[in-house]
Amino acid sequence: MMRTHYCGSLTEAQIDQTVTLCGWVHRRRDHGGVIFLDMRDRDGLVQVVIDPDTPEAFATADKARSEYVLKITGRVRRRYEGTENPNMVSGQIEVLGKEIEVLAASETPPFPLNDDTINVSEEHRLKYRFLDIRRPEMLERLRFRSKVTNLIRNYLDDHGFLDVETPILTRATPEGARDYLVPSRVQNGSFYALPQSPQLFKQLLMVGGIDRYYQIAKCFRDEDLRADRQPEFTQIDIETSFLNDDDIMDLMEGMTIKLFNDLLGVKFEKFRRMPYSEAMRDYASDKPDLRIPLKLVDVADLMQEVEFKVFAGPAKDPKGRIAALRVPGAGSLTRSQIDEYTKFVGIYGAKGLAYIKVNEIEKGIEGLQSPIVKFIEPIVMQLLERVGAENGDIVFFGADKAKIVNDAMGALRVKIGHDLNLATCEWAPLWVVDFPMFEETDDGKWTSVHHPFTLPKSSVEDVKSNPGEALSVAYDMVLNGTEVGGGSLRIYTLEMQKAIFEALGISDEEAEEKFSFLLNALRYGAPPHGGLAFGLDRLVMLMTGATSIRDVIAFPKTKTAECPLTQAPAPVEANQLRDLGIRLREQQKKEA
């Protein structure tokens, strides 16, 4: 062993012991002929003192610079009174260095690793990710991620789950996003697909009698990237047999409660279970942030006869919605603040943001301040009564197609709640249940809300006759407005699976071509089964307070799905393409 201790592990318990440390020079200081080195490794920092009484070590320390890799042997001693550092685990002690060996020199880093006040662009950090990872903040996040996966593995092992790997090279299936395709050299003209999830394989494992499966799986989706998306991401994938939806939710809830208690000291009570219809009605979101107590109220029925087309149109449209959002005590918002909120909802397609300020409700119309009151005067007091408005409140209105209203007003609810510090708690977990089985596309076709293997609550006959009314046995775990996990019970009979394919417009021929392996499995006695998957990256991001998934992944991609470190994706040699039977079309030269 090259070292006896980690830098960050030294405490007063090691005083008077001789230790050997290996790590990087975090900071070097020269004070009155004595050199101080802050040495850093994975576990933290320790101060090393080198004085001229050890000339060889002093000479080596004199040449050392930031990020040099050193091996230091010395004696642990208590720091002099008044020089302790309460911000370091090792802040009560220091190491008097006797021997120093330079294991590797370092060029000057492209950005300082010992000064968090200097703003470094994310692109630059990702280009030199091997240096960025050395920063204590990044090291701690990756260490925390390791603790999360370790706890999850132990929990699932203790509950009888088997860790089983599923293929990375598989075939394309319709799962909602574009596949990453891998050409086959042996089967020219054919392609593998990288898995968007292990969904079908884990179902086949249940048919195979594995009973309880889990995997920390890499998944791939070729989709537009946002702050919470990566082209490759990690999923905690879980499937069980002979458990119902309540059993599965209880099991996964227990794991989440243990995770937060053991790693953050946060104690959760029993998770609330909210039907999808209630979530959309009250919060305009299928992943509501319950830290914010504000709720939306439907008022379309009151707007049926008003002459104001902005309200009358959506009120009479079967696909429209008019929702009111009462914000208690926010009547003091200025016009410029309201204008900013109007711009904000515009991001989601809203054409405007109507509002009423309630100054003195006992005065009726005269006690209100609003540019829309004159258009809805006959029903305005009914509106305010329905939303429970009081003096000092402001009520916002969204009126449009239901999707636009939900997107805009749902986002506004959360933004105003945070802007005005209305959050009532730090963590708000819940389950959203009873999702619709299908949703209608613009061209009148049905598509799966989750995926085509989700078990409906309806019978085969009801699915065939009225798919729009079918609910699914699906459940999403939501935390602070973020979906951290989602799952369902699965279809386990051939008759139901064919009925779902039929509702989705998938012909028998197409189903056999794409899913023959699954359909065959259902012919041989599939058990009732279900499961879910957690997004590991998203979960760790929430638990560490990071602002982006990229901050909790060792080597992430950018928003354009590129890796600045390795410069992937990159062109390949012509002979490699030739072996794959692929020829690239030449791009037409741009006209000068």
Curated annotation (Swiss-Prot):
One MF annotation (Gene Ontology) recorded for this entry: nucleic acid binding
Query: Which residues are ATP-binding?
Result: 221-223, 230, 483, 535-538
Example of a GO cellular component annotation carried by this entry: cytoplasm
- Residues at the site labelled Important for tRNA non-discrimination: 31, 82
* Keyword rRNA-binding in annotation: no
Looking at the record, which segments are called Aspartate?
199-202
Q: Which UniProt keywords apply?
A: Aminoacyl-tRNA synthetase, ATP-binding, Cytoplasm, Ligase, Nucleotide-binding, Protein biosynthesis
Family stated for the protein in its record: Belongs to the class-II aminoacyl-tRNA synthetase family. Type 1 subfamily.
Q: How does it assemble?
A: Homodimer.
Question: What name does this protein carry?
Answer: Aspartate--tRNA(Asp/Asn) ligase
Q: What organism is the protein native to?
A: Acinetobacter baumannii (strain ATCC 17978 / DSM 105126 / CIP 53.77 / LMG 1025 / NCDC KC755 / 5377)
- Gene designation: aspS
